[in-house]
C-alpha cells in the first residue's frame, strides 16, 4: 500500500534501486571496506575502555541512543555500521559454496588448473550454449568426468604429491586431441565425510586416500584461467573460483548483531561470541604453526574450520551444532536469513505494521454491507493524519481542543516538532497553522482496510466505511462473511487505517466491498443474502403474506421512501402483499428464474418472475438472491453497477430483519417429531432396503452376483450394499421433506436455502443412515468384525455402520460409535489439509506473481516474456463473465435452421409474396422486393449461420442440448428482453429491414474488434499486423457466432419483434457491456489465477477414494492429485490411460475382447496354486487327478513321440512343479494352453512341460519339471525360481497396464440428409497403469488389425505425454487434468485461471514444476525472487558465486527493496518536466487575495522547496480565452525506452463559478461537490466521454503512482476529504518526482502535454488500443457534475494508438467551440502504412495546435451542457 507524506519522513536522500549485482568479495575488497583488523577478541566491557582504538570500538561496541560512532561520528540510527576483518592463519572452506568447489575441481586439472575439456570441439559449445551459472558448471563437470580417463604409469612418472602424471588423452593433456595442460593423470575427487569438511583425492596406485585441505585447494583454483572460469559459468571480474575459499573473514558491525538489554544489564549477541571464538582459534592456529607441531596444527585447523562453518550455518550435516548453552543452539547467519521468520520473509517480504487493530467480530444486520462497526476505544487510538488548510482549519481545531471523542492525539508541525495533546493541561488554547498535520481520531465515514486471515484471495482484504459503535468488538454485516470465510464463533479480524490520501483513494476506487461483489474466480457473486435475511425474504414473499398499512409505512421509513404502492386488497381494509414490499427494494431489472428441485407450476407460486423491478410471482430463495451465478445480485451488478447492489442488499436486510422482528420465527420440538404416517413410510423404506441387502448377500454366497469390472466378488458385494444403503437414505430424505407440513420451520429454512437440507430432517426425525469411512462401510477392526458385540464375519447392515434411529429418538451405543468414526475422519482431514493447501497456495503465488496484462493486450511476466497472446484466450476480465447462456445452434437440424433463420423464396429465387407477412412492415417488404441484391444478402446470412453451426459442432465440447452453456461477457438474451420491455412498442410487425439488421450486426462486430488494444492499428482502425489481427479475431470468434445466431434478422423481426429504437439500444448496450468486460492493462492476473486455484483447494479432501459402483479404477483426488500435477511428478500413484478403439471394437461385446487383449497378463496372475511334488515316474503319477490328463496328452501324440517324451521326463528332475490355473480367468482371456506352454519356454527352456496342451478339460493344470536332476538342491532352487519365472511369463496385453476397465462415452454424429445431430454410445477402455508408447504401437486383434485408435488415446501422466507428443499436447493434458481435479469436488473455476497457470508451467518448452525444483531452477526469475521463496542462502550463495544480476523487475524483488512493483498502477511512470515549473510561486502567494490563481503541489519533504507548479489565468473580458503557462506533464509507461517528445496544448475553458475582482480571477466559495467540470473529450475509436478531473495535491512524490486504470483521480479523493479551498481552483498540473524509469527499448517514446490535456473516459481506460508509451492525464477542473458522472470522471490514463490519425480534442456536443484544439498524430518519416510482424517498430511524434487556435466558450454553451447533463 502506498504511503503518504502526511507524517514526517526520514531526511536521508533516497534513490530507486534499478538493479542488484551479486558477487563474492575478494580479499582486497574486504580489507578496503573494513575499518580495522580484528586480532584480539574484545568483550563489550574492556573494548569501551580502549583509548586510541576508535575503529576497534565501532566494530565491537553497539551504539546506544546517546552515543556517537567513533568512526563516522554519527548517532544511532544514522550510523550504518562499520566492518572489520580477520586475517585467517590458513584458508578455510566457505561451507555455503563447498559443493561448488567440488564441482570446479572435477572440471580442472589438479596439477596445473587447466580445464579438462577440449574447448575447440563444437559439441562443447553446443551443449553449453543456453546454459548459465550453476547449470553450466554442472554440465561442464559432467562432460569432464565422461572424458577423463586415468592412465597407468611407472613410479618414475609420479607428479606432485605422488600422483600419476602420465598424459591424459582427449583432455587438456599433451596426448592426441589435447590442446593444452600439463598431462598429469587426474585422480577422482570426492567428499570426505569426516569430522570436518575435507576434499579427498583418490590416487591411482595408493592404498590410502590423500587429504587436501583448503590451502592446497586454493592453490589449484588459483591456477584456473579467466577463460576457463567463464566457460564454467563464472564471471572472473566478480567471482573467480579462487574466491570460493576464504582467506579473510569479514566481521559484521554491531548493527547486525546488536546487544540485548534487560533489567539494566547488557548481553552480547550470539554471533559476537562466535566471532570471538573464531579470533581465538585463528590466533591459536598461528601459534601452532610457529611451533611446527603437526598434530597441534591439524587440531587447530579443524577447530577453526568448524567454528567458521557453524558461524555461517549451524544446521549443517558436516558438524555437530554449536551450542550457546546446554540447551540453546547458536543462531547462525543462515538461520537468521532463511525460513518464515528470517530476514527475507519475516522482515522484508512482510512485516508488522502500525495503525492497525484486531479484535473479535460479531454480526450486525443494521449496518451497511460496506460498513464495519468500530469500538470507541479503537477509534480513539487509531488516527488519520489530516493536513490543515483554510477549509478544514476550523474543524481540525475543534478536534484538537476537544478532550472527548471525536478528538485528536498529535499535531505535527512543519519544523518537525510533535505536540502530544494528551499532555497539555489546557487544550482549549491550541491553535493550528496552515501546513500542520493533525492526527485525528477515526470517525464515521472514514475508509479502512478490513482483513481476515488466512488471506486466501483478494476478497479476504476489502475496504469498509467506519461506523463507530459501543462495546468492544468489530461489527460486520452478515453478507460479508462469505468472502472472508468468517463466522461469529470467536473469529478475529484485522483493521488497518490508511495514512495518506493516495492510499485512501486506492481503497475507495479498487478495494471497497461493492467493487468486489463479483469474484473473478467463478465469475459469480461472492456475496449475497444469507441466513436470517434469506429466511425473511422467503417468508416475506410467500403467497400467503399480507401486510397492513402500519407495517408498510414502517418499511418505507427504513427504505427512505415517501410514496407507497397501491394496496393489493382494498376491502375490508387495505393490505399489501409481501411481494409488493420486496419490489420496493428492487431496481428496474428483469429476472426470470426457477428455483431448483421445484416443479414449474405457476399456480403453485414456484416460478420467480421479475419484470421491470416488480416481483410478479414466486418466493425469493437462495438461488435468486444468494451468491450464485445468474442470481439477482449478479444481474443487478451487471446492469446497474456495484452501488445499486449494495443498496439492494442493505434494503433487503433492513426490511427482512424488521419483518422477522414483527412476525417472529422459531423452531420447536414439534418440528422435529414425525407423524405416524411418515414413520410408517420410513419403516417400509428400511424393510425394503434390508431385504435388498439380504438378496445381494445371498447372491454373493451363491457366487451368482454380477462382478463389476476389475473387482473381486467381495468388492462387488460391498459396492452394491453401500449403494443400496445410500439410496435408502436419499429416498427417505425426499419422502420426509414431502410429508412434513408446509409451515414446519425446518422445511421453511430448507426451502429458503438459509440452512439445512432434506437429509438433516431425515436424520433428526427418522434415522441417521449409513456411516462411511473413506468412502466405504465401517471395516472390520476387531477379529473379523467391527465390534466385539457382533458375530464373526457379520456383513449385515447393522454391524457395518447402519444407524436405524434418528437424533430425536437417540442412537444406540454401537450406532453412536460408528457415527463418531465417520465424524472423526472429517476432523482429521481438516487438520491435515490446512498446511498442505497453505503451502500449495504459496507456491502458486510465487510462480505466478509477476504475470500481468500488458498494454498491447498480451500476457507477460516481469521480463516481458510472452505468456499468452490474449488473456484467457479472449482478453476478458473474469469478474465480467456471465455463464449459463444456452447455445442451441449445434443441435438445430436443417428444418429448424430453415424455420428459424431462412426466409421464404419463390422457385425463381426471388422473395415469396408471403415473406414477412405477419412480422414485417409492408414498406420494408416492398423495399426488399425492389432490389434483387437483397436476396443474395439474406442467403449469405443463412450460409454464414450454417457455417457457424458446423464450426460449433467441431470446436465445442458437446454433451446435451440443455447442458451446452456458454460463458460470455455479455448476456444478449437478457439485453433483448430489456430492449423489448423498455424500448419496444407493443406491435405485431417491426419497422426494421433485414438488410439493416445484417449491416448493423456486422458493423457491431467490426466495432468490437476496435475495442481491443493493438500497436498496429491504422488511421482507419484496421489492424495491419497479421498476428495481432488473428489473435483478436480468435478472441471474438465464439462471441460473434453466438451474436449472429441470436441477432439473425429473421429472429429479430419474427421472434423478438424489435423496432428500430429498441434494436439500436440493444446494439449499443452490447458494445458497452463488452467494452466494460475487457481486462485492465496492468492487472496482476497471475496472482488472481493463483488465488483462484489455491483458495478452492481448501475445500478438497486429502483422501484417495475407491470409486464404488460402475468403475473400479483407483484415482487420486483432491490435494494429492493437485500436488502430482503441479510438481510434475513422474511417479504418479494412480497413472492411467483412456484407450480409444477402432470399430467394431468400440461396441460393448467386442470391447470386452479388446479389454483382455490390452490388460497385461502373466502366468502368475492366472495361477491359483503352486505345488512341488516328488513324482519321478509320470507313467505312475502319485497325483491321481493328473492321470487322465497325462494319458490324454500321450494319446494325442504318436507312439514314438510319446516314448521319447517319457524318457525325457524320467531323465529330468524327480520333482514336479504343478500349477493350477484359474479356469474362469483362462476362459475370460481366451488363453490357449499351447500359447501358455510356448510363453514358458520362451522365458526359460530348461523346463519340460508335461501337460498343458489340451483345452477341452475342465481343470487347467500345468505340470513341469527341470531337465536337470540336481538332487537335494532341487526344492530350494525351485521355490526360489518358480515364482520369479511365473511373473516373467508374459501371456498377453501391454506391459504396465495392470487392469483394463470398460468405459462408455458419447460420440456425436450428423445425419447428412436431415442435418440432425445425435449422440451414439461407444465404448473405450480405462486402464490402471500407463504405457502410452506401447499403446501407440498398437495391439493386434483377432482379424490381424490394430484395435487401438492412437489419435484419441491419452494418458493422465503429463510428463509421459510431454515426452511422446511434445509440450503443446502436455499443455492440453495438464489443463484437462487440472479442471477434472477441481470438478470432482464441484468446484467450477473460470477457464482463464487454468490457462494462466498451465501456460506458465509450459512457457519454456518444458514442464516447470511449481516447487523449489522448478521455480528456483528457472532462468526467468531473479535471485531476489528465488531467495524469497525457498533455499534463501543457497540461492544467494549461487548468485554471488556466478555474478548474477537481478534487474529488479519482479514483484518480490521490488518489495524487498521498497520499490513500487511493476504491475497495476506501477506498470507506467510519470515524468515531470522540471524546467516548466521554474515560474511557479509558493503556496502562500498562490492563495493570497488579489493574486493570480496558482496551485501548489506538495511532493514530499525532500522536494517541497524545489518543485512548484502554477497555472495563471489573465482574462481580458468575459469571452476571452484564458492562457496556460508552459507547465508540461510527461507520462510514459515503464515498458519501452527513449524520449521523443513534442508539446501538446489545449485551451482551458472559462468556469462560471469564478468571479473577477480588479481584473484578476479568484475562486469563489464553491462546495466540494461542484469542483468537477466537463472537459474536452478526445474522440477515439468511436468513444468519447468527459474525463477531466481536478488533480490537486500529491503527497509524497517518492510514493506517488498514478491511480489504477479503474480508479478515480487522487484529486477527487483529496478535494472531497481534505476540503482545501486553495485546491478548488480551475486548473492545475500534476507533477511528480518519479523520473527514474526502467530500461526501455528504442522504439517507445515519451509524450509531453502542456497545461490541461483532456482524455476520453472508458470504463477500463487503460484497455484502449494503444502503445504504452503514450499516456495522458487530465488536469482540468470546472463546473459541477452529477453524482454518477463524478464517480466516473477521474485521472484516467488511457493510451492512444500511434497509427490512428486525426484524434480531435473537442467538447461534448453541441459545444463545438473547442473542436479546433486538436491533437494530430503523424508518423515520423511520412504516412506509410506498416505491416510488420514485430511490435513497436516505428517511432511516432505528435503535433499539436497552439492554444490561440481554440475559440473561447460562451456562457450559453455552458448552460446548454448543464441542461444536457441534468
Curated annotation (Swiss-Prot):
Component of the RNA polymerase II (Pol II) complex consisting of 12 subunits. Its main location: nucleus. This is DNA-directed RNA polymerase II subunit RPB1-B. GO terms for molecular function: DNA binding; DNA-directed RNA polymerase activity; metal ion binding. Residues 1742-1756 have a biased composition (Low complexity). Belongs to the RNA polymerase beta' chain family. Its EC number is 2.7.7.6. InterPro entries: DNA-dir_RpoC_beta_prime, RNA_pol_asu, RNA_pol_N, RNA_pol_Rpb1_1, RNA_pol_Rpb1_3, RNA_pol_Rpb1_3_sf, RNA_pol_Rpb1_4, RNA_pol_Rpb1_5. Residues 1660-1766 are annotated as: Disordered. GO terms for cellular component: mitochondrion; plastid; RNA polymerase II, core complex. The keyword Oxidoreductase does not apply. PANTHER family: DNA-DIRECTED RNA POLYMERASE, DNA-DIRECTED RNA POLYMERASE II SUBUNIT RPB1. It is found in: Nucleus. GO terms for biological process: DNA-templated transcription. Mg(2+) 2 binds at residues 487, 489. The binding of ribonucleoside triphosphate to the RNA polymerase II transcribing complex probably involves a two-step mechanism. The initial binding seems to occur at the entry (E) site and involves a magnesium ion temporarily coordinated by three conserved aspartate residues of the two largest RNA Pol II subunits. The ribonucleoside triphosphate is transferred by a rotation to the nucleotide addition (A) site for pairing with the template DNA. The catalytic A site involves three conserved aspartate residues of the RNA Pol II largest subunit which permanently coordinate a second magnesium ion. Residues 813-825 are annotated as: Bridging helix. DNA-dependent RNA polymerase catalyzes the transcription of DNA into RNA using the four ribonucleoside triphosphates as substrates. Largest and catalytic component of RNA polymerase II which synthesizes mRNA precursors and many functional non-coding RNAs. Forms the polymerase active center together with the second largest subunit. Pol II is the central component of the basal RNA polymerase II transcription machinery. It is composed of mobile elements that move relative to each other. Keywords: DNA-binding, DNA-directed RNA polymerase, Magnesium, Metal-binding, Nucleotidyltransferase, Nucleus, Transcription, Transferase, Zinc. Zn(2+) binds at residues 69, 72, 79, 82.
Amino acid at each position: 500500500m502506498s504511503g503518504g507524506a502526511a507524517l514526517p519522513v526520514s531526511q536521508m536522500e533516497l534513490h530507486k534501486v534499478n538493479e542488484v549485482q551479486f558477487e563474492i568479495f575478494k580479499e582486497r575488497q574486504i580489507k578496503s571496506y573494513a575499518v580495522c583488523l580484528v586480532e584480539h577478541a574484545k568483550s563489550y566491557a574492556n573494548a569501551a575502555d580502549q583509548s586510541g582504538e576508535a575503529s576497534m570500538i565501532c566494530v565491537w561496541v553497539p551504539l546506544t541512543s546517546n552515543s556517537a560512532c567513533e568512526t563516522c561520528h554519527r548517532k544511532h540510527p544514522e550510523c550504518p555500521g562499520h566492518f572489520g576483518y580477520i586475517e585467517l592463519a590458513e584458508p578455510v572452506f566457505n561451507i555455503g559454496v563447498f559443493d561448488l568447489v567440488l564441482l570446479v575441481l572435477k572440471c580442472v586439472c589438479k596439477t596445473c588448473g587447466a580445464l579438462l575439456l577440449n574447448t575447440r570441439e563444437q559439441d562443447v559449445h553446443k551443449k553449453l550454449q543456453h546454459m548459465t551459472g550453476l547449470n553450466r558448471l554442472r554440465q561442464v563437470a559432467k562432460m569432464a568426468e565422461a572424458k577423463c580417463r586415468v592412465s597407468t604409469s611407472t613410479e618414475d612418472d609420479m607428479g606432485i604429491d605422488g600422483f600419476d602424471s602420465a598424459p591424459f588423452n582427449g583432455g587438456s593433456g599433451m596426448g592426441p586431441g589435447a590442446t593444452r595442460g600439463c598431462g598429469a593423470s587426474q585422480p577422482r575427487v570426492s567428499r570426505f565425510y569426516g569430522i570436518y569438511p575435507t576434499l579427498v583425492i583418490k590416487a591411482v596406485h595408493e592404498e590410502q586416500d590423500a587429504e587436501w585441505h583448503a590451502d592446497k585447494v586454493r592453490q589449484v583454483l588459483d591456477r584456473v584461467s579467466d577463460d576457463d572460469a567463464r566457460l564454467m559459468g563464472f564471471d572472473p571480474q566478480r567471482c573467480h573460483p579462487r574466491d570460493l575459499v576464504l582467506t579473510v573473514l569479514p566481521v559484521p558491525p554491531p548493527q547486525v548483531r546488536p546487544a540485548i538489554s534487560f533489567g539494566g544489564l547488557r548481553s552480547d549477541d550470539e554471533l559476537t561470541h562466535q566471532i570471538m571464538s573464531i579470533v581465538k582459534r585463528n590466533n591459536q592456529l598461528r601459534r601452532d604453526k610457529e611451533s611446527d607441531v603437526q598434530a597441534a596444527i591439524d587440531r587447530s585447523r579443524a577447530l577453526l574450520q568448524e567454528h567458521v562453518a557453524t558461524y555461517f550455518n549451524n544446521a549443517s550435516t558436516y558438524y555437530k551444532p554449536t551450542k550457546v548453552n546446554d540447551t540453546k543452539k547458536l543462531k547462525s547467519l543462515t538461520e537468521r536469513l532463511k525460513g518464515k521468520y528470517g530476514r527475507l520473509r519475516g522482515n522484508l517480504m512482510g512485516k508488522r505494521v502500525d495503525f492497525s487493530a484486531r479484535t473479535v467480530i460479531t454480526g450486525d444486520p443494521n449496518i451497511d454491507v460496506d460498513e464495519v462497526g468500530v469500538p470507541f476505544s479503537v477509534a480513539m487510538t487509531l488516527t488519520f493524519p489530516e493536513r490543515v488548510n483554510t477549509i478544514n482549519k476550523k474543524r481540525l481545531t475543534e478536534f484538537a481542543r476537544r478532550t472527548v471523542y471525536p478528538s485528536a492525539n498529535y499535531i505535527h508541525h512543519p519544523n518537525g516538532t510533535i505536540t502530544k495533546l494528551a499532555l497539555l493541561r489546557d487544550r482549549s488554547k491550541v491553535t493550528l497553522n496552515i501546513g500542520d498535520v493533525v492526527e485525528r481520531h477515526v470517525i464515521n465515514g472514514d475508509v479502512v482496510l478490513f482483513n481476515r486471515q488466512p488471506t486466501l484471495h483478494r476478497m479476504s482484504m476489502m475496504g469498509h466505511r467506519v461506523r463507530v459503535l459501543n462495546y468492544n468488538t468489530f461489527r460486520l454485516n452478515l453478507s460479508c462473511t462469505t468472502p472472508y470465510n468468517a463466522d461469529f464463533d470467536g473469529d478475529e479480524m484485522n483493521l488497518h487505517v490508511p495514512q495518506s490520501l493516495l492510499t485512501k483513494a486506492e481503497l475507495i476506487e479498487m478495494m471497497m466491498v461493492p467493487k468486489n461483489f463479483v469474484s473473478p474466480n467463478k465469475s459469480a457473486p461472492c456475496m449475497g443474502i444469507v441466513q436470517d435475511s434469506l429466511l425473511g425474504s422467503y417468508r416475506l414473499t410467500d403467497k400467503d403474506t399480507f401486510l397492513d398499512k402500519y407495517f408498510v409505512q414502517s418499511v418505507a421509513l427504513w427504505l427512505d421512501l415517501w410514496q407507497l404502492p397501491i394496496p393489493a386488497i382494498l376491502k375490508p381494509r387495505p393490505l399489501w402483499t409481501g411481494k409488493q414490499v420486496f419490489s420496493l427494494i428492487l431496481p428496474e431489472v428483469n429476472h426470470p428464474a426457477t428455483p431448483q428441485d421445484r416443479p414449474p407450476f405457476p399456480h403453485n407460486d414456484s416460478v420467480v418472475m421479475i419484470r421491470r423491478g416488480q416481483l410478479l410471482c414466486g418466493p425469493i430463495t437462495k438461488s435468486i438472491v444468494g451468491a450464485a451465478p445468474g442470481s439477482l445480485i449478479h444481474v443487478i451488478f451487471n446492469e446497474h453497477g456495484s452501488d445499486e447492489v449494495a443498496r439492494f442488499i442493505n434494503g433487503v436486510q433492513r426490511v427482512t430483519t424488521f419483518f422477522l422482528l414483527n412476525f417472529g420465527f422459531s423452531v420447536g420440538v414439534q418440528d422435529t417429531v414425525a407423524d405416524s404416517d411418515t414413520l410408517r413410510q420410513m419403516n417400509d423404506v428400511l424393510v425394503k432396503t434390508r431385504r435388498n441387502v439380504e438378496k445381494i448377500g445371498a447372491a454373493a454366497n451363491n457366487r451368482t452376483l454380477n462382478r463389476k469390472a476389475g473387482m473381486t466378488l467381495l468388492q462387488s458385494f460391498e459396492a452394491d450394499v453401500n449403494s443400496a444403503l445410500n439410496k435408502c437414505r436419499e429416498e427417505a430424505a425426499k419422502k420426509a421433506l414431502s410429508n412434513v407440513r408446509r409451515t414446519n420451520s425446518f422445511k421453511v429454512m430448507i426451502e429458503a436455502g438459509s440452512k439445512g437440507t432434506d437429509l438433516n430432517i431425515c436424520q433428526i426425525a427418522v434415522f441417521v443412515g449409513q456411516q462411511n469411512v473413506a468412502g466405504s462401510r465401517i471395516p472390520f477392526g476387531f477379529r473379523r468384525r467391527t465390534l466385539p458385540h457382533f458375530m464373526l464375519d457379520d456383513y449385515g447392515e447393522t454391524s457395518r455402520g447402519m444407524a436405524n434411529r434418528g437424533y430425536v429418538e437417540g442412537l444406540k451405543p454401537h450406532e453412536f460409535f460408528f457415527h463418531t468414526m465417520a465424524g472423526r475422519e472429517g476432523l482429521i482431514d481438516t487438520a491435515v489439509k490446512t498446511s498442505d493447501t497453505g503451502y500449495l497456495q504459496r507456491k502458486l503465488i510465487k510462480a505466478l506473481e509477476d504475470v500481468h496484462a500488458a498494454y498491447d493486450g498480451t500476457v507477460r511476466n516481469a521480463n516481458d516474456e510472452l505468456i499468452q497472446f490474449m488473456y484467457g484466450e479472449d482478453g476478458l476480465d473474469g469478474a465480467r463473465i456471465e455463464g449459463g447462456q444456452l447455445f442451441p445452434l449445434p443441435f438445430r437440424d436443417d428444418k429448424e435452421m430453415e424455420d428459424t433463420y431462412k426466409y421464404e423464396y419463390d422457385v425463381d429465387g426471388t422473395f415469396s409474396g408471403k415473406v414477412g407477412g405477419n412480422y414485417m412492415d409492408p414498406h420494408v417488404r416492398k423495399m426488399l422486393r425492389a432490389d434483387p441484391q437483397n436476396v443474395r444478402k439474406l442467403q449469405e446470412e443463412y450460409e454464414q449461420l450454417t457455417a457457424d453451426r458446423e464450426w460449433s459442432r467441431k470446436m465445442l465440447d458437446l454433451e446435451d442440448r440443455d447442458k451446452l452453456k456458454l460463458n460470455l461477457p455479455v448476456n444478449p438474451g437478457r439485453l433483448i428482453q430489456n430492449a423489448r420491455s423498455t424500448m419496444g412498442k407493443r406491435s405485431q410487425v417491426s419497422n426494421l429491414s433485414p438488410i439493416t439488421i445484417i449491416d448493423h450486426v456486422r458493423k457491431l462486430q467490426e466495432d468490437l474488434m476496435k475495442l481491443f488494444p493493438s500497436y498496429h492499428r491504422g488511421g482507419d482502425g484496421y489492424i495491419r499486423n497479421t498476428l495481432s489481427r488473428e489473435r483478436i479475431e480468435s478472441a471474438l470468434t465464439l462471441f460473434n457466432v453466438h451474436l449472429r445466431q441470436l441477432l439473425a434478422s429473421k429472429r429479430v423481426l419474427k421472434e423478438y419483434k424489435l423496432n428500430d429504437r429498441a434494436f439500436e439500444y440493444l446494439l449499443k448496450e452490447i458494445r458497452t457491456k463488452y467494452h466494460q468486460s475487457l481486462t485492465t492493462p496492468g492487472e496482476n492476473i497471475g496472482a488472481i489465477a493463483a488465488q483462484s486455484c489455491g483458495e478452492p483447494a481448501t475445500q478438497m479432501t486429502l483422501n484417495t477414494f475407491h470409486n464404488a459402483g460402475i468403475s473400479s479404477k483407483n484415482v487420486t483426488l483432491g490435494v494429492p492429485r493437485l500436488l502430482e500435477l503441479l510438481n510434475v511428478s513422474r511417479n504418479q500413484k494412480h497413472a492411467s490411460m483412456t484407450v480409444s478403439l477402432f470399430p467394431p471394437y468400440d461396441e460393448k461385446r467386442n470391447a470386452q475382447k479388446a479389454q483382455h487383449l490390452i490388460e497385461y497378463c502373466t502366468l502368475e496372475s492366472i495361477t491359483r496354486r503352486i505345488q512341488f511334488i516328488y513324482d519321478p515316474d509320470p507313467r505312475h503319477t502319485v497325483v491321481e487327478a493328473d492321470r487322465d490328463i497325462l494319458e490324454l496328452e500321450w494319446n494325442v501324440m504318436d507312439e514314438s513321440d510319446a516314448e521319447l517324451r517319457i524318457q525325457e521326463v524320467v531323465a529330468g528332475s524327480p520333482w514336479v512343479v504343478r500349477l493350477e490355473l484359474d479356469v474362469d480367468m483362462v476362459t475370460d482371456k481366451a488363453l490357449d494352453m499351447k500359447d501358455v506352454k510356448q510363453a514358458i519356454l520362451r522365458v526359460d527352456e530348461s523346463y519340460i512341460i508335461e501337460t498343458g496342451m489340451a483345452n477341452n478339460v475342465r481343470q487347467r493344470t500345468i505340470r513341469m519339471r527341470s531337465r536337470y536332476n540336481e538332487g537335494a538342491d532341487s526344492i530350494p532352487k525351485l521355490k526360489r525360481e518358480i515364482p520369479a519365472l511365473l511373473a516373467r511369463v508374459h501371456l498377453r496385453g501391454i506391459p504396465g497396464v495392470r487392469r483394463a476397465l470398460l468405459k462408455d462415452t458419447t460420440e456425436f454424429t450428423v445425419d447428412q440428409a436431415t442435418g440432425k445431430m445425435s449422440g451414439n454410445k461407444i465404448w473405450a477402455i480405462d486402464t490402471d497403469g500407463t504405457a502410452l508408447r506401447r499403446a501407440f504401437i498398437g495391439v493386434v486383434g483377432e482379424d490381424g488389425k490394430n484395435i487401438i485408435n492412437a489419435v484419441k488415446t491419452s494418458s493422465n501422466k503429463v510428463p509421459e505425454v510431454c515426452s511422446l507428443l511434445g509440450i503443446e499436447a502436455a499443455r492440453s493434458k495438464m489443463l484437462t487434468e487440472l479442471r477434472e481435479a477441481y470438478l470432482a469436488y464441484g468446484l467450477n473455476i473460470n477457464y482463464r485461471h487454468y490457462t494462466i497457470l498451465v501456460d506458465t508451467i509450459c512457457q519454456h518448452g518444458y514442464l516447470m514444476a511449481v516447487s523449489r525444483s522448478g521455480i528456483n531452477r528457472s532462468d526467468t526469475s531473479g535471485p531476489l525472487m528465488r531467495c524469497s521463496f525457498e533455499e534463501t542462502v543457497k540461492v544467494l550463495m549461487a548468485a554471488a558465486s556466478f555474478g548474477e544480476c537481478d534487474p529488479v523487475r519482479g514483484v518480490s524483488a521490488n518489495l524487498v527493496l521498497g520499490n513500487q512493483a511493476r504491475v497495476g498502477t506501477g506498470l507506467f511512470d510519470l515524468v515531470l518536466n522540471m524546467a516548466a515549473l521554474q515560474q511557479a510561486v509558493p503556496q502562500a502567494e498562490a492563495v493570497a487575495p488579489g493574486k493570480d490563481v496558482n496551485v501548489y503541489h506538495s511532493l514530499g519533504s525532500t522536494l517541497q522547496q524545489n518543485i512548484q507548479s502554477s497555472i495563471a489565468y489573465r482574462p481580458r473580458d468575459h469571452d476571452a480565452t484564458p492562457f496556460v503557462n508552459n507547465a508540461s506533464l510527461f507520462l510514459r509507461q515503464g515498458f519501452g525506452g527513449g524520449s521523443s517528445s513534442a508539446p501538446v496544448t489545449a485551451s482551458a475553458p472559462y468556469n462560471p463559478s469564478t468571479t473577477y475582482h480588479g481584473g484578476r480571477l479568484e475562486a469563489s466559495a464553491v462546495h466540494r461537490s461542484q469542483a468537477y467540470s466537463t472537459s474536452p473529450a478526445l474522440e477515439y475509436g468511436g468513444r468519447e466521454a468527459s474525463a477531466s478531473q481536478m488533480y490537486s495535491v500529491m503527497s509524497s512524490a517518492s510514493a506517488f503512482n498514478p491511480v489504477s486504470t479503474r480508479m478515480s483521480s487522487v484529486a477527487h479523493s483529496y478535494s472531497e476529504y481534505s476540503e482545501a479551498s486553495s485546491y478548488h481552483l480551475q486548473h492545475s498540473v500534476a507533477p511528480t518526482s518519479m523520473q527514474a524509469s526502467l530500461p526501455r527499448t528504442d522504439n517507445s517514446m515519451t509524450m509531453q502535454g502542456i497545461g490541461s490535456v483532456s482524455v476520453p473516459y472508458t470504463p477500463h481506460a487503460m484497455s484502449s488500443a494503444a502503445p504504452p508509451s503514450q499516456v495522458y492525464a487530465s488536469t482540468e477542473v470546472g463546473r459541477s457534475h452529477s453524482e454518477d458522472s463524478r464517480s466516473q470522471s477521474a485521472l484516467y490514463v488511457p493510451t492512444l494508438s500511434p497509427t490512428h490519425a486525426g484524434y480531435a480534442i473537442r467538447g461534448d456536443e453541441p459545444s463545438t467551440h473547442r473542436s479546433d484544439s486538436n491533437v494530430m498524430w503523424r508518423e515520423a518519416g511520412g504516412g506509410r502504412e506498416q505491416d510488420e510482424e514485430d511490435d513497436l517498430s516505428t517511432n511516432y511524434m505528435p503535433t499539436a495546435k497552439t492554444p490561440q487556435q481554440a475559440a473561447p466558450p460562451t456562457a450559453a454553451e455552458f448552460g446548454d451542457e448543464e441542461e444536457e447533463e441534468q
